[in-house]
A protein has these predicted regions:
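Fe(II)/2-oxoglutarate oxygenase catalytic core
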Residues: 1-156, 162-188
Length: 188
């Protein structure tokens, strides 16, 4: 690996971000679960958020193609890991009313025997003026990006799924993000 993360600042315009928020908000709500020991469970001490799944369908084809190309570019220049696909994006809402957050974690479930999450993606959909707190942060990382850049609306962050990260509690307003995991053969 050449680096621990990379980002594409303001890749999506504010109008594109608002369109994603509007369309994704119409999708059914799912439980925000976490992976522990090969199982999924709800744990509000670890994670408080509302999620909706965006499936890889013709309605969302342009978004998937766009993010797929960014991940391929990031992988080629920064990570060089073996990955194969991403089935769905997670549209996530963190709200002040329940102090939306996600404590330090990594996205790979090493207990799964066949496929591992290899590259993670986080897209900042909200205007940073619309909320306080809710910072996406890398932890246990040698070098971290400037928080101003990771809060910029439309920015796409790509990183290996074994990298620890968190979202601090939202203290005012609401933060929306799009999250994706590109899977592939087991980490070695």
């Amino acid at each position: 690996m050449v680096s621990e993360w990379c980002y594409f600042k303001q890749h999506f315009s504010p109008e594109q971000c608002q369109d994603i928020i509007r369309r994704a908000s119409l999708l059914p709500v799912s439980d925000a679960s976490i992976g522990k020991g090969g199982e999924f469970a709800k744990d509000e001490d670890t994670r408080r958020s509302i999620i909706r799944w965006i499936r890889r369908t013709s309605e969302w084809a342009d978004l998937f193609t766009d993010v797929d190309l960014l991940v391929a570019k990031a992988n080629s220049t920064h990570f060089q890991v073996a990955y194969q696909y991403c089935n769905a994006f997670q549209f996530t809402e963190y709200d002040e009313s329940y102090q939306g957050h996600y404590i330090e974690h990594m996205d790979t479930f090493l207990a799964f025997p066949n496929v591992h999450r290899k590259l993670s993606v986080s897209v900042q959909l909200s205007d940073p003026a619309d909320y306080s707190g809710g910072d996406f942060e890398f932890t246990k990382c040698g070098q971290v990006p400037n928080p101003i850049n990771t809060r910029t609306q439309g920015t796409v962050i790509v990183f290996p799924s074994i990298t620890y990260h968190k979202v601090t509690p939202v203290t005012k307003g609401k933060r929306y993000s799009l999250v994706a995991w590109y899977e592939g053969p087991q980490w070695r």
